[in-house]
Each structure stands twice: as structure tokens, then as C-alpha cells.
Amino acid sequence: MSDGLQRCFVLHRRPYSESSLILDVFSEEYGRVTLMAKGARGKRSNLKGALQPFTPLLLKWSGNGSMKTLRQAEPISLGLPLSGVYLYSAMYINELVDRVLMPEVASPGLFHDYLFALTELAQSTNPEPALRRFELALLAAMGYGVDFLHCAGTGEPVSPDMTYRYREQKGFIASVRRDNLTFLGNELIAISERRFTSKEQLQAAKRFTRLALKPYLGGKPLKSRELFRQTTLPRARSTEE
């Protein structure tokens, strides 16, 4: 049972029976929680339009099993204005949290990172920095502690101009070869600071987070990523034609 109304966002919703919904929500104090919203799809339900992703909510629930029962719901404000690539980016963030975060593990810091990422997506002209910062925050919240600033082999500080090879769960060691597993020192420093000043640094951060998140996703593709590809590829082809 929740202790009063909780700040939440809907990560995913799916219909259940004729009039109900099953919700995966991300709450500030309880982490990821699964709720049964009885009658939420009914014609007379005042919750019909409120239980949507990207809408800040206050929710209260009861129950001790893996699926709780929603008892009260109030929207805090209107949903965040997301469309196009920014909407797909936000859907990707939701799917990541739903897929990799353990249920009912309090993550108030990550909740704030999530809210900040959605706000950034609603206001920015480039979704990539917000996505990379959130992926790194998610990895940190799961205890994925990689030292980007020191060589795993020697403990020496990373040099901006040197090349380093990533070793899963261990860190980075100096390397003379360049491939998909290697990064320049300045890229590692940018990832550590979550501050990206060049396209190359953003691309390096994307490579790293994909490598680091891969074990948590279990080889199952992300639906949001595939949906984005299906939507954008036909548009790109028509532009070329």
C-alpha cells in the first residue's frame, strides 16, 4: 500500500478485461510499480484521459502482491508537449525504465533524472544529450560503477588524447587499436561529466551506453527503437525520391 498520494508517471499501459487497465508506473518513493486500474476505460470513468504516459500524476494504491490496485488518481498538470523524434525518445526512456529497473526499489534520484530528461526533451532542439544523460543516470542507479577518469590497469588518470579499450564491468585500459570498444580520453571525460561539446563525444556516449545496457536488456530488441525506425525510414525514402 502506498503511503498517501505519490508522484508518478505512467511508463506503459495495456487494456485488461472490458473496462480496466494494467499500468506500469514509475513513482518517486516506490520505484517501478504495477497497478490495476479497475474501470479506468469505462465510459463514466473520470480517469479515462488522465492515465497517460508523460502526464505528471498523483496516485494512491493498495495491496501487497506484485500487482496493486489503484485507489486514487489526480493529474498534477497537463502532459508534457512531446511530438516527433522527441516523443519517440521519451517512449524509449519509458521502455528502458520498464525493462531494466527492478520492481518496487525506491529510486528518488532517478525519478528526478527522469523528470529532468522529459523536460529537456520537451524544450530542446536535439534529443541526444538528454538521452545520453538519462542512460548514464539509469546505469548509476542500478549500481553500474565504471570509473571513466582512471585507467583500470594502472589507476593513472585518463589522458584526453590517448585511446582506451572498454572491458565490461571493469573499466577502461590503454589501447593502441581503435574499434567499437575503444574511446578517446576526452570522450571518457565528457561521459563522466555528462557534458557533451561535440558530435563525436555524443556518438561515443551512445556507443558506451549501448554496450553497458546490453546485458540488462537480455537480447530482446526495444520496441520504441523499432517503431522509430519504421516511422522515419519511409519518410527518408520519400525525401530521397
From Swiss-Prot:
Keywords: DNA damage, DNA recombination, DNA repair. GO terms for biological process: DNA recombination; double-strand break repair. Pfam families: RecO_C, RecO_N. GO terms for cellular component: bacterial nucleoid. SUPFAM superfamilies: ArfGap/RecO-like zinc finger (SSF57863), Nucleic acid-binding proteins (SSF50249). HAMAP family: RecO. Belongs to the RecO family. Involved in DNA repair and RecF pathway recombination. This is DNA repair protein RecO.
